[in-house]
A protein has these predicted regions:
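Hydrophobic "lid"/C-terminal helical patch
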Residues: 117, 146, 189
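N-terminal regulatory/sensing modules of transcriptional regulators
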Residues: 1-126
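Conserved catalytic core of two-component sensor histidine kinases
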Residues: 107, 114, 136, 143, ...
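Regulatory hinge/linker segments at domain boundaries
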Residues: 120-149, 154
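Recognition helix of helix-turn-helix DNA-binding domains
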Residues: 151-191
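C-terminal edge and immediately downstream basic/flexible tail or linker adjoining helix-turn-helix-like DNA-binding
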Residues: 194-199
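Hydrophobic packing within well-folded, soluble alpha/beta domains
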Residues: 3, 16, 50, 71, ...
Length: 199
């Protein structure tokens, strides 16, 4: 397999590239860290798989997801797989919707990653999972208020609801986001775009 890896974190990208090239199944894994270099390298050779980081903010005005369709326009036979530390359903859903053949968590072991890449090279494609139930406007208000550090009694008073009703809303938020506590729910709500982080 010939793989083109685009990740804006140099230490991670260079290490992963060297690691993958140690596997017999991979003949080359060329690493790039910025978008200009990426398009140049993509155009001069044929690649079996393009492995893209979702978050490319440091080196690109686009996210990895934004690049998927552009890659297929230039190299329709190349398969695009996403690599990310953000294993959020909304990102996974959008990436697969735009044509990515797989969405791989950065926490995967080298062995798991190579197995996934081998499966991709043989035509395997991930299916789009169902998206989480969306938070209601009220639920988004609540999780945002929780992030400010207000007590549950203060939040209930501001929203003119009982504390019992507030707890019901909070439990619904946890269930929808797959969160175990308020901090995890708040961080996931930010990652999914339901609320913006406090500055």
């Amino acid at each position: 397999m010939k793989i083109l890896l685009f990740d804006d974190h140099r230490i991670f990208g260079e290490s992963l590239s060297k690691l993958l090239e140690d596997w017999d199944a991979i003949s080359i894994c060329h690493y790039v860290s910025n978008e200009t270099e990426f398009w140049n390298i993509l155009s001069v050779d044929e690649w079996d798989i393009v492995l893209l980081d979702v978050n490319l903010r440091d080196q690109s005005k686009n996210s990895g997801i934004d690049l998927i369709e552009k890659i297929y326009n230039k190299k329709p036979k190349t398969k695009v797989a996403m690599l990310s530390s953000y294993d959020m359903p909304v990102y996974r859903q959008e990436a697969l919707k735009r044509g990515a053949v797989s969405y791989i968590d950065k926490s995967a072991s080298a062995d798991e990653l190579v197995k996934k890449l081998t499966a991709i090279s043989k035509g395997h494609k991930s299916t789009t999972p169902p998206l989480l139930d969306p938070l209601t406007y009220r639920e988004a208000e609540i999780i945002k208020a929780i992030g400010t550090g207000k007590t549950k009694h203060e939040i209930a008073q501001e929203l003119y609801i009982s504390v019992r009703t507030l707890y019901n809303h909070i439990q619904s938020i946890y269930d929808k986001l797959g969160a175990k506590n308020a901090i995890e729910a708040y961080n996931k709500a930010i990652a999914l775009g339901y609320i913006t982080p406090l500055i």
